[in-house]
C-alpha cells in the first residue's frame, strides 16, 4: 500500500475522532468491525482533544498505523491494520497498544 495515501486517510480518521463524528469513524472501518465501535469508544479519551498519527508502516497488501489519541483524562495509542477495499484504505483490525 502507498504510505502517503494511507497517511491521508489515517489523518482524516483522527480528525473525525476529534470531532466526535462517529458516522465518519464508522465509514473508515470494515462492516465486520461496526459492532465493536461502542467498545472502542470506551477505550478512547472522551472528549478526544488531539489525534496524532505516529507511524504508517506500509507492506504490499496492508499498512500498520499507530494513532495516539489524547484527552483531558488519558492518552491511548491504537494500532490499526488498514487494507484497501476497492481503492479505499479501510481499517480491518484495531486494538490499543499496551
State what each model feature region is.
Residues 37-85, 93-98:
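Surface-exposed, charged secondary-structure patches
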Residues 3-4, 34, 60:
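A generic structural signal for ordered alpha-helices
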Residues 18-20, 29-40:
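Short, non-transmembrane alpha-helical segments in secretory-pathway proteins
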